[in-house]
Amino acid sequence: MGTDINVIAEVRRNGVWELSTAKVFKNPWYDQASNKKWAMEEYMSQPDDSRNYNLFAILAGVRNGEGFAGCRTGERFKPISELKGYPDNMSKNDVLFGDEYGYGSWLTLRELHEYDWEQLHRNYGYVDEDTYRDYIMNGEQPNSYSGDIWGHNIIKLTEPEMVDLINDEYPRDESKEYYTACYFAPITYRECASWFYDETMEGLRRLIPDGGTEDDVRIVFEFDC
């Protein structure tokens, strides 16, 4: 079963946390020519809630190194914080389910800003022969990969066996497709959650009230597992 996130932005004014309704968050699905409601507006009042297990792990240690059905997806991240629960002074909203699920947490903009986003992480997954040769062996990120792979014509090889196959030193069956699981070249946490880092955090910075600080803006979120 997959995991999704529900998230709101809040601003503290005069000591009270309020739900932010300002449209400051860029819409990743925006399409000027679209007639779909979710794609028509360039900016939204809620942070993007797209599924990104790397981000979930960074925010709260959720799905840390695990993908769909628990398959390994990479090294474990060092989360900003483990799940804190919902804040007692959370604003009223119709986005979050609350304690009914119990997977809530929150982070201030200061916590997000002071986190080390330049830490390195390596993703892990199954790649086919062409991808391994063209990307992995050159120290580059693959253009596609899977948490696992199976099928009638699929053969899983170890990495040394894949190298031998590419070098024509492993017996090949032309009716089969060959895959291997491996770690990829390191990338930064920032790159693992680039939309959140580049766009969502920029939107949060725009919410800092006059005379306020990064402590006066936060996200409250929950995971729907």
Map each language-model feature to its residues.
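Short A/G/S/P-biased low-complexity tracts
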Residues: E214-V220
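Acidic (Asp/Glu-rich) sequence patches and key acidic residues
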Residues: M1-T213, D224-C225
